[in-house]
Amino acid sequence: MHAEEIIRSIEAEHFKETLPTIYVGDTVRVGVQIREGNKERTQPYEGTVIAKRHGGINETITVRRIFQGVGVERVFLIHSPRITNIKVVRRGKVRRAKLYYLRDRVGKATRVKQRFDREL
């Protein structure tokens, strides 16, 4: 067995099969497993997907939201065991693969139009 085949077989064990189709511009709610002391809980993080990076097991999404007037971005490894669930709240209609321009916008200018032709 070659090294590439070994890596692919290990990655296949950790792949999550039941993920929704996520597009840039979508508003998603990501459930993140958090440890506080000796307790574990799921913390929801809701925001707009501004970037998506493909790469098999290393696939990531960058989610941006405004919290107390400050823009907060988090990068999530989609296949990470810390991600308990991902739910698409609404579909967004955009013409770009990366929405980094939203970082410079304030208030209502950061809104993304809703798209109705794709299923949630």
Curated annotation (Swiss-Prot):
Q: Does the keyword tRNA processing apply?
A: no
Biological processes annotated in GO: translation
Q: Which GO terms describe its molecular function?
A: structural constituent of ribosome
Renumbered to this chain, the signal peptide range is none
Task: Report the SUPFAM superfamilies cross-referenced here.
Answer: Translation proteins SH3-like domain
Q: Which Pfam families match?
A: Ribosomal_L19 (PF01245)
Listed InterPro entries: Ribosomal_bL19 (IPR001857), Ribosomal_bL19_CS (IPR018257), Ribosomal_bL19_sf (IPR038657), Translation_prot_SH3-like_sf (IPR008991)
Q: Where would one find coiled-coil regions in this protein?
A: none
Superkingdom of source: Bacteria
The answer on whether this UniProt entry bears the keyword Ribosomal protein reads yes
A Gene Ontology cellular-component term: cytosolic large ribosomal subunit
Q: Which UniProt keywords apply?
A: Ribonucleoprotein, Ribosomal protein
Question: HAMAP family, alphabetically?
Answer: Ribosomal_bL19 (MF_00402)
Identify its protein family. Answer: Belongs to the bacterial ribosomal protein bL19 family.
NCBIfam families for the chain: rplS_bact
What does this protein do, in the record's words? Answer: This protein is located at the 30S-50S ribosomal subunit interface and may play a role in the structure and function of the aminoacyl-tRNA binding site.
Protein name in the entry: Large ribosomal subunit protein bL19
Q: Which organism is it from?
A: Acaryochloris marina (strain MBIC 11017)
